[in-house]
From Swiss-Prot:
GO terms for cellular component: cytoplasm; nucleus. The keyword Signal does not apply. Induction: By oxidative stress. It comes from Cricetulus griseus (Chinese hamster). The modification Phosphoserine is found at S108, S112, S163. Coiled coil: none annotated. This is Calcipressin-1. It comes from the Eukaryota. Inhibits calcineurin-dependent transcriptional responses by binding to the catalytic domain of calcineurin A. Could play a role during central nervous system development. Signal peptide: none annotated. Belongs to the RCAN family. CDD domains: RRM_RCAN1 (cd12708). One of its GO terms (molecular function) is nucleic acid binding. The gene is RCAN1. The lineage of its organism: Eukaryota, Metazoa, Chordata, Craniata, Vertebrata.
Length: 197
C-alpha cells in the first residue's frame, strides 16, 4: 500500500470565508481579491462555494506567508476570515495499488488454492421428522401432542387450522347475486378532415 505524504504548498493559501456574498456578488468578490492583491500582483483565485473556501495562489511563497501573517483571523465584512497553507497530496503513483493477497481465490472451486486447501461439503438439511409425521396423521379439527408435559416444561401440541372453504363459498355466492355494472360506451367525437373543410 502506498503511504500518503502531505506536503504543504507554501505558495497557496486556503481562506475559510463565512460570508457567502463572496461567491455570488462581484463587488464583494472584488473587495476580497483587493485584500490579497496588495501582497502579490500575479495572484489567482479559485472559489469553492459549497465548501465556503477560496484557494489563493501566489507567485512566490514569501508573499503568501506575508499575507497569512497579516490577514489571518481578521474581519472581512463583519465575519472572521481564517487562512491556512494549502496541502497537496502525493500518493506516489497515479494507478491504484492492488489489494493485499490475503484471500484472492474463489471459494468453490478454487482457481489456484493455497497449499492444504480442501473442499468444504455442504451440510445436510435439518428435517424434523417428528413434526412431519405428526402433521401427516392430523385431520381437520384434531390435535397432536409432540412432547408430553413434565414438571419443568410444558407440552408441545400441534393444532391444524380449519379451512376457510365455507367463508369462500359464501363470498362467491354474494358475488354472483350482485348485478354486474353496466359499461356505457362513450361516443366518438365528431371528426372532419382538414382537407375536406
Amino acid at each position: 500500500m502506498h503511504f500518503r505524504d502531505f506536503n504543504y504548498n507554501f505558495s497557496s493559501l486556503i481562506a475559510c470565508v463565512a460570508n457567502g456574498d463572496v461567491f455570488s456578488e462581484s463587488e464583494t468578490r472584488a473587495k476580497f481579491e483587493s485584500l490579497f492583491r496588495t501582497y502579490d500582483k500575479d495572484i489567482t483565485f479559485q472559489y469553492f462555494k459549497s465548501f465556503k473556501r477560496v484557494r489563493i495562489n501566489f507567485s512566490n511563497p514569501l508573499s503568501a506567508a506575508d499575507a497569512r501573517l497579516q490577514l489571518h483571523k481578521t474581519e472581512f465584512l463583519g465575519k472572521e476570515m481564517k487562512l491556512y497553507f494549502a496541502q497537496t497530496l502525493h500518493i506516489g503513483s497515479s494507478h491504484l495499488a492492488p489489494p493485499n493477497p490475503d484471500k484472492q481465490f474463489l471459494i468453490s472451486p478454487p482457481a489456484s488454492p493455497p497449499v492444504g486447501w480442501k473442499q468444504v461439503e455442504d451440510a445436510t438439511p435439518v428435517i424434523n421428522y417428528d413434526l412431519l409425521y405428526a402433521i401427516s396423521k392430523l385431520g381437520p379439527g384434531e390435535k397432536y401432542e409432540l412432547h408430553a408435559a413434565t414438571d419443568t416444561t410444558p407440552s408441545v401440541v400441534v393444532h391444524v387450522c380449519e379451512s376457510d372453504q365455507e367463508n369462500e363459498e359464501e363470498e362467491e355466492m354474494e358475488r354472483m347475486k350482485r348485478p354486474k355494472p353496466k359499461i356505457i360506451q362513450t361516443r366518438r367525437p365528431e371528426y372532419t378532415p382538414i382537407h375536406l373543410s
